[in-house]
């Protein structure tokens, strides 16, 4: 059986790590390189950087951060945010990224998923899905631009399509659960797992170690991603992994 992974996520804006609740109200958390080194020592299985900078200067700072971070990490580094071409992907990989996460650009141009997976390999291409339940339309829909822009694309249709186009992994964020620390969106995740066979990383709602136990016992996702509880030192990745192991969940130990 594949061991379950715990992944911290760092939202980086203009060179600083920030965090909000349900994609709003950003607050400063700290220096990305220092936090990455901390999580590397804390037994994180991977690290995700999402570049939410709005400026060219912010994106350039991100490349410097990736390069410095990659030189200090012994775990895979995934970069997302503002990636719109295979040239962008190539630049990130050259600066030290192991994987890239595509979201808005893939929804805008699905052929990018196929082109990128063929050029760099499926294992390199993760599709980030910001999913929100809409009562009026009775389904989950994809959102873009950091959760600000609704689309008419149903989540289940989209994940099927990107798997077919060659994506190697999904990073699924439940916008309804994001940052509120009440547990993961099992219903959404189980629906996705019924229509795809590629690994799914669950994001949005992790508030304590029991939430990760519930996630891995009640869904078939391969990893759980969180930010708030780790950034705020409410618990550590090591403590979560120990708790998971005690509850019979097979986790990675480095």
UniProtKB/Swiss-Prot annotation:
Keywords: Amino-acid biosynthesis, Cytoplasm, Histidine biosynthesis, Lyase. The keyword Amino-acid biosynthesis applies. Pfam families: His_biosynth. GO terms for biological process: L-histidine biosynthetic process. It is an enzyme of class 4 (lyase). Its EC number is 4.3.2.10. The keyword Amino-acid biosynthesis applies. GO terms for cellular component: cytoplasm. It is found in: Cytoplasm. Its main location: cytoplasm. CDD domains: HisF (cd04731). The active site is at 11, 130. Belongs to the HisA/HisF family. IGPS catalyzes the conversion of PRFAR and glutamine to IGP, AICAR and glutamate. The HisF subunit catalyzes the cyclization activity that produces IGP and AICAR from PRFAR using the ammonia provided by the HisH subunit. Heterodimer of HisH and HisF. This is Imidazole glycerol phosphate synthase subunit HisF. It comes from Staphylococcus carnosus (strain TM300). The gene is hisF.
């Amino acid at each position: 059986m594949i061991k379950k992974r715990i992944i911290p996520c760092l939202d980086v804006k203009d060179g600083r790590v920030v965090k909000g609740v349900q994609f709003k109200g950003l607050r400063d958390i700290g220096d990305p390189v220092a936090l990455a080194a901390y999580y590397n020592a804390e037994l994180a299985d991977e690290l995700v950087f999402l570049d939410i900078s709005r400026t060219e200067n912010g994106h350039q700072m991100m490349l410097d951060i990736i390069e410095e971070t990659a030189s200090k990490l012994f775990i895979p580094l995934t970069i997302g945010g503002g990636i719109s071409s295979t040239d962008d992907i190539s630049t990130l990989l050259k600066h030290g990224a192991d994987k890239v996460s595509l979201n808005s650009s893939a929804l805008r141009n699905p052929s990018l998923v196929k082109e990128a997976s063929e050029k760099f390999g499926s294992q390199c291409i993760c599709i980030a899905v910001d999913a929100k339940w809409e009562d009026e339309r009775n389904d989950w829909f994809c959102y873009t631009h950091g959760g600000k822009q609704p689309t008419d694309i149903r989540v289940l249709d989209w994940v099927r399509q990107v798997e077919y186009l060659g994506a190697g992994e999904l990073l699924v964020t439940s916008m309804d659960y994001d940052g509120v620390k009440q547990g993961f969106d099992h219903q959404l995740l189980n629906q996705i797992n019924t229509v795809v066979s590629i690994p799914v990383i669950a994001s949005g709602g992790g508030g304590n170690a029991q939430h990760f136990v519930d996630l891995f016992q009640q869904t078939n996702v391969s990893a759980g991603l969180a930010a708030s509880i780790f950034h705020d030192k409410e618990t550590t990745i090591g403590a979560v992994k120990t708790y998971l192991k005690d509850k019979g969940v097979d986790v990675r130990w480095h």
